[in-house]
């Protein structure tokens, strides 16, 4: 880890913390919630050893990157704008793009808005979400899964913050990062995420040192920046009306664990394997379902995921 360089880049009106290592073709890694650049620590080291320039920022609202206070500052347009500006500042014309969780969602939008800047895409966990012409994203989730669905619970400012603040940050991160129940998370307001089981001991792939790194950053920032991605998602729906029905025109590979909660959302498997995904992403070359892996797959199965990424991008 000591070889990883840390810099701050000014982009799109914010200061962005960026971790990077290596030289060669650039690979841009986008993390999810509740995570940081650190979620890609294994992939950074592996891809750099294979002759790539591996770059992983803390996204807007996370870690050592600025966190604007308003939820309306966290649309896909803001996040993609940050990343295009980052590439411009680094003098990089095109990248291989790798995303997970919210990072995967933003990677889909990056490819939708600026396919000219992407050589190829590897996304983990979160498939492309087709824009319904009349139903906003969060409204659709609420209709399908009800108010207790975690995505809906994160909408009201202050509520999720109080829930996450009711236990120590390290304990909450242990609960969240080790979730293995593949069912969509239903979190009754009176119980909250604090009711989730705390693993003891931690799984082999997540150390106390890892938790300490994540917790040290989230103790400083809180979780509001991350929650704001959920709170801005209906606004993203409004702003992406011009792209309604558009296809992703980038060569892509998709990887998901068979215990990933997103893989078990209503209709997800049918979309991924039944032709809808390939229709929306016509250059989708491969879907890999990893047996026995849950949501935080890049950390749980680092060697396997690193190899799957490398095997795809080396073709370009």
UniProtKB/Swiss-Prot annotation:
PANTHER family for this protein: EPOXIDE HYDROLASE
Function: Epoxide hydrolase involved in the biosynthesis of cucurbitacin and mogroside tetracyclic triterpene natural products (e.g. siamenoside I and mogrosides IV, V and VI). Cucurbitacins have cytotoxic properties and exhibit deterrent taste as a defense barrier against herbivores. Mogrosides are nonsugar highly oxygenated compounds used as high-intensity zero-calorie sweeteners; they also possess pharmacological properties such as regulating immunity, lowering blood sugar and lipid levels, protecting the liver, and acting as antioxidants and antitumor agents.
Protein name as catalogued: Epoxide hydrolase 2
Gene name linked to the record: EPH2
Top-rank taxon, per record: Eukaryota
Contributes to the formation of an oxyanion binding site for the epoxide oxygen of substrate, annotated site positions: 150, 230
Comment field (misc): Mogrosides, the major active constituents of S.grosvenorii fruits, are a mixture of cucurbitane-type triterpenoid glycosides that have been proven to be powerful and zero-caloric sweeteners and can hence be used as a sucrose substitute for diabetic and obese patients.
Reaction equations catalysed: an epoxide + H2O = an ethanediol; (24S)-24,25-epoxycucurbitadienol + H2O = (24R)-24,25-dihydroxycucurbitadienol
Biotech applications: C.sativus and L.esculentum expressing S.grosvenorii genes SgSQE1, SgCS, SgEPH2, SgP450, SgUGT269-1 and SgUGT289-3 accumulate siamenoside I and mogrosides III and V, thus providing a strategy for vegetable flavor improvement or for heterologous biosynthesis of mogrosides.
Protein family per UniProt: Belongs to the AB hydrolase superfamily. Epoxide hydrolase family.
Annotated an epoxide binding sites: 150
UniProt note on tissues of expression: Highly expressed in young fruits 15 days after anthesis (15-DAA). Also observed in stems and leaves.
EC number: 3.3.2.10, 3.3.2.-
Any single Pfam family the record assigns to this protein: Abhydrolase_1
GO MF annotation list: hydrolase activity
Enzyme class: hydrolase
Active-site annotation: 101 (nucleophile), 230 (proton donor), 295 (proton acceptor)
Quaternary structure annotation from Swiss-Prot or TrEMBL: Homodimer.
Pathway info: Secondary metabolite biosynthesis; terpenoid biosynthesis
AB hydrolase-1 domain segment(s): 25-302
Keyword annotations: Hydrolase
């Amino acid at each position: 880890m000591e070889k990883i360089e840390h810099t701050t880049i000014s982009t799109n009106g914010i200061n962005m913390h960026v971790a990077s290592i290596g030289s060669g073709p650039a690979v841009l890694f986008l993390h999810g919630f509740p995570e940081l650049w650190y979620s890609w620590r294994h992939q950074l080291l592996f891809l750099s050893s294979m002759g790539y320039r591996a770059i992983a920022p803390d996204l807007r609202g996370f870690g050592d990157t600025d966190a604007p206070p308003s939820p309306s500052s966290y649309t896909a347009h803001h996040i993609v704008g940050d990343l295009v500006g980052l590439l411009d500042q680094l003098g990089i014309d095109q990248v291989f793009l790798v995303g997970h969780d919210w990072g995967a969602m933003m990677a889909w939008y990056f490819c939708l808005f600026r396919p000219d800047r992407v050589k190829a895409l590897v996304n983990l966990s979160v498939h492309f979400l087709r824009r319904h012409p009349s139903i906003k994203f969060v409204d659709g989730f609420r209709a399908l899964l009800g108010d207790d669905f975690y995505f809906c619970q994160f909408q009201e400012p202050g509520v999720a913050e109080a829930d996450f603040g009711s236990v120590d940050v390290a304990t909450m991160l242990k609960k969240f990062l080790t979730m293995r129940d593949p069912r969509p998370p239903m979190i009754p307001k009176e119980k909250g995420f604090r009711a989730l089981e705390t693993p003891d001991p931690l799984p082999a792939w997540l150390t106390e040192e890892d938790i300490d790194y994540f917790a040290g950053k989230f103790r400083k920032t809180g979780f509001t920046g991350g929650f704001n991605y959920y709170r801005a998602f209906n606004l993203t729906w409004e702003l992406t009306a011009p792209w309604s029905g558009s296809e992703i025109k980038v060569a892509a590979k998709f990887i998901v664990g068979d215990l990933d909660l997103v893989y078990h959302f209503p209709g997800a498997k049918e979309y991924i394997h039944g032709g809808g995904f390939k229709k929306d992403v016509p250059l989708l070359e491969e879907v890999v379902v990893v047996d026995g892996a849950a949501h935080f797959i890049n950390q749980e199965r680092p060697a396997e995921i690193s190899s799957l990424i490398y095997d795809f991008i080396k073709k370009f």
